[in-house]
Swiss-Prot record:
Superkingdom assignment: Eukaryota
Domain annotation SRCR: ranges: 682-785
Region (Disordered): 610-689
UniProt feature, compositional bias: Low complexity: 620-629
Listed name of the protein: HHIP-like protein 1
Gene assigned in the entry: Hhipl1
Residues of this chain annotated as glycosylated in UniProt: 240, 461, 679
Amino acid sequence: MAGRRAVARIGPGALLVLRALLAAAHPQCLDFRPPFRPPQPLSFCAQYSAFGCCTAEQDAALARRFRVLETRMDAGVWATCAGYALDLLCQECSPYAAHLYDAEDPATPLRTVPGLCEDYCLDMWQTCRGLFRLLSPDRELWALESNRAKLCRYLSLDDTDYCFPSLLVNENLNSNLGRVVADAKGCLQLCLEEVANGLRNPVAMVHAGDGSHRFFVAEQVGLVWTYLPDRSRLEKPFLNVSQAVLTSPWEGDERGFLGLAFHPRFPHPSKLYVYYSVGVGFREWIRISEFRVSEGDENTVDHGSERIILEIEEPASNHNGGQLLFGDDGFLYIFTGDGGMAGDPFGKFGNAQNKSALLGKVLRIDVDRKERGLHYGIPPDNPFVDDPGARPEVYALGVRNMWRCSFDRGDPMSGTGRGRLFCGDVGQNKYEEVDLVERGRNYGWRAREGFECYDRKLCANTSLDDVLPIFAYPHKLGKSVTGGYVYRGCEYPNLNGLYIFGDFMSGRLMSLRENPETGQWKYSEVCMGRGQTCAFPGLINNYYPYIISFAEDEAGELYFMSTGVPSATAAHGVIYKVIDPSRRAPPGKCKIRPAQVKVRSHLIPFVPKEKFIRTPESTPRPTARAPTKAPRRRRPTAAPPAPTPRPTKPARPTRRPGARKGGGRRRGRPSTAVPEPENGSVRLVRPAGLSPGRGRVEVFIGGRWGTVCDDAWDTKAAAVVCRQLGFAHAVRAAKRAEFGEGRALRILLDDVRCAGSERNLLECAHAGVGTHNCKHDEDAGVECSHQDPNL
């Protein structure tokens, strides 16, 4: 790794310089959070009115302490010592208060007097040594009061860069203070907070916009989970269409449950819309459906309310699109892929350039009315409603496979940017791109990929009239863009207006910021905070490399979802919240008051699993820079290399769950190791032709799969297995090898007795792993269901 090699060459003396440089990026308050800009000027510690760690209330409290000190000192002495008292009291407001008071480590006692530089301490001792006793209850400090050298040693800091008052003139600490920290190469250093884990390819996270501040997380297999503002998860799924969803465990299968969106006036009506893959015989389709929330439980969908709005046949198993969004206009925007395979080979110009095809498009429909024999209405201002050769649903064309789009909420103060539609469009051989989608525009595919021609004849067609992306990057940086969001949240003002996105294959986080004067977009990579930047409670500096999707919560804060194993059945997905360690909003400004929601399901509390890594490796970046604007020649004449043929089977498509295996966290390059199943994982093995949810139970323990004996096997044990597999109900516990004997495996569990609430069979009472008095003709099985068998 480039950064690692650099450190290896630096000697002990130079390493101190490096530490000082790293310290420049680490302002922190005594509450272990970033400093802020007070909403109103401070009257006592006025030097920290622009940026620091005190509110007006805290400033007033320090002023009261100052006045108390004045009453406890002789007037003549106070005239000499008041300046020292002001200096020391106000260091609680310093943007580096955590360093001044040795609060970097929450486990160590907090100083009562800030760390002082030697010269300052010696001068203060000479004239105002009695002030130390009044400032601090520390009796050890009191005992040193008469010994100048020992006292000043006691009040010194190990890191002298932070001692007062030298830190006030330290250029490394004060240049760009309060701005997003960037390294020498311009890589923005941010931190993360783990929000949820144990998810199977989390493809989407959305909120309902109803004031509840719940968020709903969709897994590729077809389950949607409800999370409350305290990050606990409801045990019962919000939605379960896993029996209808077409997907597989293959790493690289792009099919599955791909997107959802709540009606813009939710909960009146209490509708939501979903986007998923289905199979009918040997044909595959994408389906857009409407559901209603259950009248008896606002955290559960009425599964019988499904109304299919639109189905589009997919000629191949990849490039399925998957995004659903409602705009400010109240219309539903649907983002479809070009139908799959390489080079959009369907018809003379491909699906994406064919206005009469719904594939390779951005569609826009009205879900609140029906017309023309359709299950939806056509907005009257759709661009091609009067074109007899076009589908009226088409809003924009020339799309290859837009994976993750978002509407800009607009600047919180001015509203600038509101309604802009950003999309990441996955490329073919050379480029990934970010587009600003507008009504009636053509985004170039398959004529163009990024800024370059892909199909020479189409590219030279004067009627193409395509729009270039706002940004495109070569495959040196990544091979599968994941579109993100423009940050418009409250908590981190420095991020306002920053478009943050990523790449699924390289695990790279990236950002764009628009220059309002030129309209150009500036690219910056996003890195995890180095050194101690993120070393505070609740923050981490690493993530799993396969970036699947981005999200924003109801308050506008930014998240992303990634996994170490890109399979729809691997529970390795994690949701991370993006944190700016350089500056936060003033305390209390972003407080939310969630609307109350009745909870009828058991709650599963959130338990973080990810850890802060103390020596993160820097991320090597290619020397070739990604283009941030179009080349001067609008129409390149040279054709790109012929497209690489792609397999028609969905085992290794160009989009989500990637072609490479691996589960390493993103610090340097992703690891190539594939994690094995967790201890206690289960699977069902069933004879051919048997429906899903029924089969012989096999359990993974100690690195191997094995069977379970049916002694004491009952529906409580079956319920544990079914819940692990994503089913809400256990219909029955099967015995006597009803679903076949697992003779090739060892018998791993016997005499299993469960209460029914355990997370896996290992938590149930049992005879001991590998201990049994049975044969395979007693192999246990289960029958699971998404529906209550008693209804």
